[in-house]
């Protein structure tokens, strides 16, 4: 259908306004969905002729150029037409969550995405908060930051009671018990989250490799090792994924503590039981591990897991961006490491 005159001008103005609305939403500049939807509620064809001409002039001399600059600055292949399609999808659902690769195929790759350290299995999340990304390491690392801070805070609170004799402590038994419960809970969270972070990082490596490389050249055993992330053990992921993907091995002393010591605590938390672990897994007392998870073990676990991740990251080469979540977890963990070092010197 060929539009003429007023109708063609109305469509031109409407489309430009819809594209602008999407741009503002992606930048987090929309105050409400009502504001976002407003450009689509106007019957532009019924505007007075003078107003229609004025808006058309503004679109052609200003608005379209602003839209094009926005696309060029933030996307590789975004167009006005694609922005309008994105508007229609957002109008239907209000928010949008879509895998990054699907977003690239449907709309456009996003400028600076890989350079900033986001993994390609990220989910693109568009809402009134703007354009954001979500992926497992992001969630687990943020959870770890919170839990580590809770450990530090509770330990600081306990320090104020250290120089008191037991008779004095009995007077504050309720307060002390509450602090101890907080620190014990936070330590359990840190241990579980540290392993979850490591495993989702390793699974992400395998997924990315399978997406980019021609894995048909690999043996069936190696393909299954990469793809069957549910049944492949953590030990095999740490030791085999770097070899398959980068042709390099993790140093044995890098993962000994995590696999042979820390994992016993983690397994006792994930599978608590009065039964001891099977002999092939060390035959250790699960309850003993469950009840005696101390700050030194937590600190060593975090330190070694960070070292494993950084060793693998180094295999990617100097030009590979640092995972966007890694600096924050390192900075937070440093405070815990300092606390452990301080306690040892007392």
Where are these regions (language model features)?
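A solvent-exposed, charged loop/short amphipathic helix patch at secondary-structure junctions
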Residues: 166-174, 218-223, 281-292
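Charged, amphipathic alpha-helical oligomerization/scaffolding segments
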Residues: 197, 257-264, 268, 297-300, ...
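Short non-catalytic regulatory patches outside canonical folded cores
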Residues: 202-260, 272
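Histidine-centered, metal-coordinating catalytic motifs and their short helical/loop contexts
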Residues: 252-284
